[in-house]
């Protein structure tokens, strides 16, 4: 597992999140800060790092570091076909993504470790009148590792701006099952119901 301190990881994630928005020409008109809370403040600047390790008879969540709004449910072992695999639910206390949100997620599956990671529900990206929201995902699967990362769908609402960057690093003998689903928002609702 990586040797960076938790604080260094958070700072690196923050810097990366700032850059991905600035590097996107589509988002240049939306660099203004929302009136409520500027991006980078508590609850707007989420960070989650999960590390999984092989412990012989089963894999475990060996390390977790988080910043609001992320929470993680304790590991469950409910997959009968793979009883040694921990199943983890990522929970967000805000329940949605708002303008100015910056989220970073890092998942590292160590040598011969296994994990199933998902979310508690669909991620709703709400309407925005300023700025944008962004997400950076770094996923690493080491030799012999196996990861199922299947978050529930992302639902962007009208006038939302959401930038997501995902970096995948899978060793030659590692396996990753990854899904990303985007659904339209309330297409058939009346204008006043949005």
Locations of the language-model features?
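Terminal catalytic/cofactor-binding subdomain
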Residues: 1-132, 188-194
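One face of beta-strands
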Residues: 48, 103-105, 135-137, 145, ...
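Feature marks extracellular polysaccharide-active and adherence modules
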Residues: 110, 142, 169-171, 179
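General beta-strand structural signal in soluble alpha/beta enzymes
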Residues: 117-119, 148-151, 178-179
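A structural signal for the main folded, soluble domain(s) of proteins
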Residues: 133, 140-142, 184, 193-194
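Short acidic-hydrophobic catalytic motif
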Residues: 153-156, 161-163, 176, 180-194
């Amino acid at each position: 597992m990586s040797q960076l301190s938790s604080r260094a990881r958070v700072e690196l994630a923050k810097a990366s999140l700032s850059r991905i928005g600035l590097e996107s020409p589509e988002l240049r008109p939306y660099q203004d800060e929302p009136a409520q809370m500027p991006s980078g403040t508590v609850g707007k600047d989420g960070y989650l790092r999960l590390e999984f390790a092989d412990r012989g008879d089963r894999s475990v969540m060996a390390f977790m570091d988080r910043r609001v709004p992320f929470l993680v449910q304790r590991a469950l072992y409910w997959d009968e076909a793979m009883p040694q695999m921990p199943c983890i639910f990522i929970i967000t206390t805000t329940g949605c993504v708002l303008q100015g949100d910056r989220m970073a997620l890092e998942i590292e599956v160590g040598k011969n470790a296994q994990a199933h990671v998902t979310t508690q529900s669909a991620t709703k990206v709400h309407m925005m009148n300023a700025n944008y929201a962004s997400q950076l995902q770094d996923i690493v699967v080491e030799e012999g590792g196996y990861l199922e990362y299947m978050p529930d769908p992302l639902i962007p609402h009208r006038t939302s701006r959401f930038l997501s960057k995902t970096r995948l690093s899978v060793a030659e003998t590692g396996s990753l099952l990854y899904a990303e689903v985007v659904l339209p928002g309330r297409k058939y609702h009346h204008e006043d119901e949005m």
